[in-house]
Amino acid sequence: MWRVVTCALTSRIESTSHQPASPSTPTAMAGDTDTEAPHVVEDCRGVLQVLSDGTTVRSAAAPYAVEDRDDGRVEWRDAVYHPAHGLGVRMYRPPRREREGKGPLPLLAYFHGGGFCIGSRAWPSVHACCLRFAHELPAVVLSFDYRLAPEHRLPAAHEDAATALAWLRDRLTGMTPGLADGSGSDEDVRAWLAGSGADPGRLFVSGDSAGANIAHHMAARFGAAGAGLGPVRIAGHVLVMPAFTSEAPTQSELSSRGNAFLSRDVAERYSRLALPAGANKDYPLMNPLGPDSPGLGLVGGRVLVVVGGEDMLKDNQVRYAERMKAVGNDVELVVFDGKEHGFFSRDPWSETGSEVVRVVRRFMDRDAADLVQPADGQH
């Protein structure tokens, strides 16, 4: 099935200015006229700075402000899913009245954006997106962190995402004995998920930007049968402005504004920091349609691709949707005219953000409707 929906909304989001993280570019050290002090050579939105001596400086602050509307109705808690790497997950469940009497709820595994270099489940923007999804879909949402570049270049993020889905499988099915996870026992996590009414048969893998890239590769990794996830069924994939690049620039890239939220300069910086040594933007994890990438095949469940009409990555995103459909996948492409990259995560409470949530809900509700259709005389 192939459906294209164009959403034309009048609201426009302006990027928020942000001061670089400390330290600022240092001057030469006192008493040393021959050696220059380490200085900033790469800066990612003031959140990550790489110094000339190779060290990195990270700020805990988010690069843009998002209104805090956490009123406590959505219940959430943190856990650690990868103790060796210190990686956490934030788990959300709808208000109790949304859970009671409505049957099992779908699961939404969510991976944040940030060019594989910045981002956190704890960022207010990521937290707000997940609050909305949990309350309004409604769904049990799990927002996973992953290792970031340049300290951990690709494929570290994708390896962590696969570990995250396996961790979720084990906690939903009790396949591993309870072990301390750093913020409570596995038994606590299992009990929390069980009390959420989560349905292991309706898992949607999702993400924004770099996280949407991860969501695609989890679809490719686990395949149509959900191999390796046991009784957990992948019902679909929600890709919001996926970060797919290509070595050859596309028309949407060439025509993008220099002051866009995701400009060519910013995208190049992320690529320099995230790609493995010697790789270019056709690296298979960055370009699923590249010359060295495995062919696209059938994935578990349907695919939703959300695109901003002014996103410099638009052409690669649309081409991806077309190719996925051509090999037999059920793909829905939704284009938000006039919107730049990151329009949802930067302002999740806007009317545009509300429309994104409605699009995702309709997409997920289709799966619920399909499940109740009789097949071969059975339900």
Residue ranges with predicted function:
Residues A30-H379:
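Alpha/beta-hydrolase superfamily serine-hydrolase fold, recognizing
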